[in-house]
């Protein structure tokens, strides 16, 4: 069983065991009317938009430094991030909905709930905890699930980042007319990363969509490798969590977009 299949099976068990219903019952609803739109930010921003991530660990990384997360988010906003991603998976990524709830009030930036969503109930919990965006991973959803979850999230006034890893998944994302598409440079089945994967997937991209390159971006040289693919932004986690000088590092990544 791949790590991804294992994670999805775990999410299914949480749904069956009432985990998400319990979260709905115990989490206070967070009002986030002051959140900005990430899509609006992308459309207005001549430079790459940055989704800066809060993460504690992953199936491949266990040595991320502990940070004052409120300060981390404050620094993300101060030094040019356009959105914040917060992992809410507890078992594999060390996150939680409680963390999302606590941190979303620390910023006016859009906040992405990054998790493995397979059911509308998870979207309800994400919204109640204060997310303004959710992630949908094409690889773990049928076409019907993808369409239904996408439409449900939009109906809840949430923005949706649809994540793809190959060209077939990109075509599936186009079918739901996704405005925001993330290209994951990490193969979630093997957890192997190649930042230039973005170039391959976006060779025949369609216009009128916004593209985010995710995973494997460690410095400005990585960004330059994929800049001419026509990306609109980057999702960066590990490099930012390891960085001790965000005031210099974050602005270096916000390069001028190159539109082909």
UniProtKB/Swiss-Prot annotation:
<dbReference type="InterPro" id="IPR013798">
    <property type="entry name" value="Indole-3-glycerol_P_synth_dom"/>
</dbReference>
<dbReference type="InterPro" id="IPR011060">
    <property type="entry name" value="RibuloseP-bd_barrel"/>
</dbReference>
<dbReference type="InterPro" id="IPR013785">
    <property type="entry name" value="Aldolase_TIM"/>
</dbReference>
<dbReference type="Pfam" id="PF00218">
    <property type="entry name" value="IGPS"/>
</dbReference>
<dbReference type="InterPro" id="IPR001468">
    <property type="entry name" value="Indole-3-GlycerolPSynthase_CS"/>
</dbReference>
<comment type="similarity">
    <text>Belongs to the TrpC family.</text>
</comment>
<dbReference type="GO" id="GO:0004640">
    <property type="term" value="F:phosphoribosylanthranilate isomerase activity"/>
</dbReference>
<keyword id="KW-0210">Decarboxylase</keyword>
<dbReference type="GO" id="GO:0000162">
    <property type="term" value="P:L-tryptophan biosynthetic process"/>
</dbReference>
<protein>
    <recommendedName>
        <fullName>Indole-3-glycerol phosphate synthase</fullName>
        <ecNumber>4.1.1.48</ecNumber>
    </recommendedName>
</protein>
<keyword id="KW-0822">Tryptophan biosynthesis</keyword>
<dbReference type="InterPro" id="IPR045186">
    <property type="entry name" value="Indole-3-glycerol_P_synth"/>
</dbReference>
<keyword id="KW-0057">Aromatic amino acid biosynthesis</keyword>
<comment type="pathway">
    <text>Amino-acid biosynthesis; L-tryptophan biosynthesis; L-tryptophan from chorismate: step 4/5.</text>
</comment>
<keyword id="KW-0456">Lyase</keyword>
<keyword id="KW-0028">Amino-acid biosynthesis</keyword>
<dbReference type="GO" id="GO:0004425">
    <property type="term" value="F:indole-3-glycerol-phosphate synthase activity"/>
</dbReference>
